[in-house]
Amino acid sequence: MPRRTAFFISDRTGITVESMGDALLNQFEVNLKRENHPFIDSPEKAHQLVNIINATAEKSALRPLVFSSIVDEEIRNIVKSSAGLHLSFFDAFLGTLEKELGVSALQFSPRINSIINTERYDARMESLNFTLNHDDGSSDRNLQHAEVILIGVSRSGKTPTCLYLALQYGIRAANYPLTPEDLQSPNLPNMVKPFRNKLFGLTIDPERLSKIRQERRPNSEYADILTCKREVSDAKAMFYRFNLPYANTTHKSVEELAVHIMQTCHLKRRY
């Protein structure tokens, strides 16, 4: 199958345009080469990028796809002059919204927008610092301020999920690893026991868990499939015993897990 190049262009980090572009591209079975170009925030950078896109178009029989989330109209128009198929999310929706709302778009520059978003940034960083300070049961200091506490066996996906909750939603997320001693106890671990209403369990298929642990400690009891089966079974028994909500991480992305946790625990994003 011929390979087409897809450019993801933004005047900021590019996360939004990648997500929206992927949502569209996932509907098609195509062979793609990806190129990410964040921080295209000046006419000079835009012209340089146009040269790259045009050079790619000349080398290929397939027109490049250009996904753009650039706010500035001047920069956006420069990128549109390239030989690629330009798909701008602002061009697609701003006109319709302006007509419906009866007002013109503000066309904030990235610099002004970053100043306006200072409060959101501060909330995100505060949540991230909290999550890092309460990763893997490292501290119970100020644990009462956690909005959710993920518990599960080692390598079940607690840390990446907490980090995503903090960065994407501004949630103060802590996590605690269930040790063999915890799993044999009829009680909740002492550190998290006072916060039962904030607990959310993560489980994982034993086979997947064993594979992940083998990468960390090959041929160890820790990674043995029987150990993994026992720990997963004991963890699920704990979740049932204390009627804790939980989710299986095996076939869920971090994004899907985060949304599920937000909905199940009735959490509100902080920005």
Swiss-Prot record:
Q: What is this protein called?
A: Putative phosphoenolpyruvate synthase regulatory protein
InterPro entries according to UniProt = Kinase-pyrophosphorylase, PSRP
Molecular function (GO) terms for this protein are: ADP binding; ATP binding; phosphotransferase activity, phosphate group as acceptor; protein serine/threonine kinase activity
Record keywords: Kinase, Nucleotide-binding, Serine/threonine-protein kinase, Transferase
Q: What does this protein do?
A: Bifunctional serine/threonine kinase and phosphorylase involved in the regulation of the phosphoenolpyruvate synthase (PEPS) by catalyzing its phosphorylation/dephosphorylation.
Q: Which Pfam families match?
A: Kinase-PPPase
Identify its protein family.
Belongs to the pyruvate, phosphate/water dikinase regulatory protein family. PSRP subfamily.
* Superkingdom of origin organism: Bacteria
